[in-house]
């Protein structure tokens, strides 16, 4: 995405580290815009972005492996400060004439370094705890570099070429385990790259409105409303930018939460005076999904059918050229890049037909979920709408595991409504980042009254997170869980067992499909 010249930016190049998105987050938390891009990005593209600094992420490979990831060495001649992290430091060393070799043993975990009073470590104590994760080590630094930190296992825990403003650290400052990691990154971003830290949601709105108006001109836009927070924020942002040129199409695919369809029409159609067309397409989606149990196939079908519905509706309108979606930055990252295996196809990223008749507008595809909520508040959307539970584009279609039926949808819909009601009553809405129920499709034996039952199991998923990239299961009080379980088995037909998901992300994803 080409950024406006007046916006300061730190470019992060991706070498496949599990932590690379954390680098981007940490920088944004400092009020400086940052984007993650593939390491193969061209010099010309980098110049267009006009970054204030470049960070080379870590990665799982060795710089000497065949086909290992690399960059155009011209990056070091752009006159822009560069910080290499772990693999990024080793690659910098190799490309600029130093030596890297395989370590006798992998260094993983906490380590103590001794740092010099340098720009990168400005204002920090000499002795610091850092997080190491590497199997190669630098044994000779390039000409013009000096060591600015060492540890018992390496004389080159951090290096710098002060004249060219090129830096490297053998540890991960972006993770919480590194004691002064945020301070080190802040020193690079604010002191070395001279960023002012003025990136705010207010500024984002101004820049995005300008870009939307420039892209759209006097043409018309369709906004895909799913009922979730993301598409709702996109709709309000677009309406602020282009007013009546926007038509929102709310596809009621029969995969929504209880009462959601009516809520969308009331809150956004009437509350924001937006032009919303509600399309009842339940039968159409259910026909396409009949007999389909593979989660990837379900996502693709739902994504395709969404666009086909828009095609049908657009044909009834005149001069519509654009389709707007609520794609998030996490969607883009998780759908895979050259250095990351696809975890799952996101509805707003994969599943779009090649012959789609619209040009896409994705105004929040550089934002994380918490940033989207902040954007929603800045746009004037009421807090109770902004803090609604995250809801995937495929809706309950991926919370019914396996083949979707009307009966299974109703079970998930009713159990989810009970869960949300109890969480709200207990005042836990802000403490738990996301919570929902799933229907695994398995049956088990139970006893209700004097009768043996053989009915479905409901799974409860509740997690704490900041941005959805990583998460932990929520420690909900047992009495609250018991209340939820009791209500579900007593009030929802065909359910005799409730289980609680206690896995983190990773290794699991938040959604079950």
UniProtKB/Swiss-Prot annotation:
EC code(s) of this entry: 6.3.5.2
Subunit comment: Homodimer.
Organism: Staphylococcus carnosus (strain TM300)
UniProt protein name: GMP synthase [glutamine-hydrolyzing]
Annotated ATP binding sites: 226-232
Function per UniProt: Catalyzes the synthesis of GMP from XMP.
Record InterPro entries: Class_I_gatase-like (IPR029062), GATASE (IPR017926), GMP_synth_C (IPR001674), GMP_synth_GATase (IPR004739), GMP_synthase (IPR022955), GMPS_ATP_PPase_dom (IPR025777), Rossmann-like_a/b/a_fold (IPR014729)
GO MF annotation: an example: GMP synthase activity
Catalytic activity: XMP + L-glutamine + ATP + H2O = GMP + L-glutamate + AMP + diphosphate + 2 H(+)
Keywords, comma-separated and alphabetical: ATP-binding, Glutamine amidotransferase, GMP biosynthesis, Ligase, Nucleotide-binding, Purine biosynthesis
NCBIfam families, alphabetized: guaA_Cterm, guaA_Nterm, PRK00074.1
PANTHER family reported for this sequence: GMP SYNTHASE [GLUTAMINE-HYDROLYZING], GMP SYNTHASE-RELATED
Residues in Glutamine amidotransferase type-1 domain copies: 9-198
Pathway(s) served: Purine metabolism; GMP biosynthesis; GMP from XMP (L-Gln route): step 1/1
Domain GMPS ATP-PPase, chain residue ranges per copy: 199-388
Keyword field contains Plastid: no
One Pfam family named in its UniProt record: GMP_synt_C
Cystine pairs: none
Keyword ATP-binding annotated: yes
GO cellular component labels: cytosol
Active-site residues (renumbered): 86, 172, 174
């Amino acid at each position: 995405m080409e950024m406006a010249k007046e916006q300061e930016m730190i470019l992060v190049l991706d070498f496949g580290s599990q932590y690379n998105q954390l680098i981007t987050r940490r920088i944004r938390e400092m009020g400086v815009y940052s984007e993650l891009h593939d390491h193969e990005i061209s010099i010309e593209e980098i110049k267009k972005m006009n970054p204030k600094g470049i960070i080379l992420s870590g990665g799982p490979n060795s710089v000497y492996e065949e086909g290992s990831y690399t960059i155009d060495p011209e990056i070091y001649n752009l006159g822009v400060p560069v910080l290499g992290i772990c693999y990024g430091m080793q690659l910098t060393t190799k490309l600029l004439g130093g030596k890297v070799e395989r370590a006798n043993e992998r260094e993983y975990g906490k380590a103590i370094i001794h740092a010099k009073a340098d720009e990168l470590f400005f204002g920090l104590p000499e002795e610091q705890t850092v997080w190491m994760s590497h199997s190669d080590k630098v044994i000779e630094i390039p000409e013009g570099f000096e060591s600015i930190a060492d540890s018992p296992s390496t004389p080159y825990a951090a290096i710098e070429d002060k004249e060219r403003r090129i830096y490297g650290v053998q540890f991960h400052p972006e993770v919480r385990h590194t004691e002064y990691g945020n301070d080190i990154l802040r020193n690079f971003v604010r002191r070395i790259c001279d960023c002012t830290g003025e990136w705010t949601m207010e500024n984002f709105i101004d820049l995005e409105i300008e870009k939307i108006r420039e892209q759209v001109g006097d043409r018309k836009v369709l906004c895909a409303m799913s009922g979730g927070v993301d598409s709702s924020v996109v709709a309000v942002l677009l309406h602020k930018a282009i007013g009546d040129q926007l038509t929102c199409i709310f596809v009621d695919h029969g995969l929504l939460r209880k009462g959601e369809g009516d809520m969308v029409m009331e809150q956004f159609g009437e509350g924001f005076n937006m032009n919303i067309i509600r399309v009842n397409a339940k039968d159409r989606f259910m026909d396409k999904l009949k007999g389909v149990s593979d989660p990837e196939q379900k996502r693709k079908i739902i994504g395709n059918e969404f666009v086909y519905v828009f095609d049908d509706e657009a044909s009834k309108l005149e001069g519509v050229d654009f389709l707007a979606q609520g794609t998030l930055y996490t969607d883009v990252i998780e759908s895979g890049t050259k250095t990351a295996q696809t975890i799952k196809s996101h509805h707003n990223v994969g599943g779009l037909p090649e012959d789609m008749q619209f040009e896409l507008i994705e105004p929040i595809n550089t934002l994380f979920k918490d940033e989207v909520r902040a954007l929603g508040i800045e746009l004037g959307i009421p807090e109770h709408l902004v803090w609604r539970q995250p809801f995937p584009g495929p809706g309950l279609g991926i919370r019914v595991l396996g083949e979707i039926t009307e009966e299974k949808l109703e079970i998930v819909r009713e159990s989810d409504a009970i869960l949300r009601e109890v969480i709200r009553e207990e005042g836990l809405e802000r403490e738990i980042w996301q919570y929902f129920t799933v229907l695994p499709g398995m049956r088990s034996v139970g006893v209700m009254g004097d009768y043996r039952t053989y009915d479905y199991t409901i799974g409860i998923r509740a997690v704490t997170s900041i941005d959805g990239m990583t998460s932990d299961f929520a420690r909900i009080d047992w009495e609250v869980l018991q209340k939820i379980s009791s209500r579900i088995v007593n009030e929802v037909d065909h359910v005799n067992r409730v289980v609680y998901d206690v896995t983190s992300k990773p290794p699991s994803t938040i959604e079950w499909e």
